[in-house]
Amino acid sequence: MNLLFKALSHPVRRRIIDMLRKGPMASGDIAAAFDMSWPTITGHLNALKEAGLVSPEREGASIRYRLEISAVEEALAFLLAMTGAQAPDEDEGTPR
């Protein structure tokens, strides 16, 4: 859990997660959205991967990253439990 929250602490990583909410993306497309060096973006992607927030899939010569929703849900459930709040029921949109 510590790796997950550490990964979420950086604004670039949160922006990458937001981009991946729309679907998987090639690493080159992710990098093109930022004015940063390739090694810096790779470092951010590796931090997200180590935290279990994204998973890479090789596609020919490129790597596509996709968001691991279960890791995001796990973090949300942890935060809700810490505050005493309840997660909404997926089927009804009401608290459990």
Question: In which residue ranges do the predicted regions lie?
Answer:
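Short beta-strand "wing" residues that participate in macromolecule-binding interfaces
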Residues: 56
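N-terminal helix-turn-helix DNA-binding core of bacterial DNA-binding proteins
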Residues: 2-40, 59-72
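Glycine-centered, phosphate/nucleic-acid-interacting loop/turn motifs that mediate DNA/RNA or nucleotide
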Residues: 52
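Alpha-helical DNA-recognition elements
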Residues: 47
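Residues within the DNA-recognition helix of helix-turn-helix
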Residues: 44
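Amphipathic alpha-helical dimerization/coiled-coil segments
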Residues: 22, 69-96
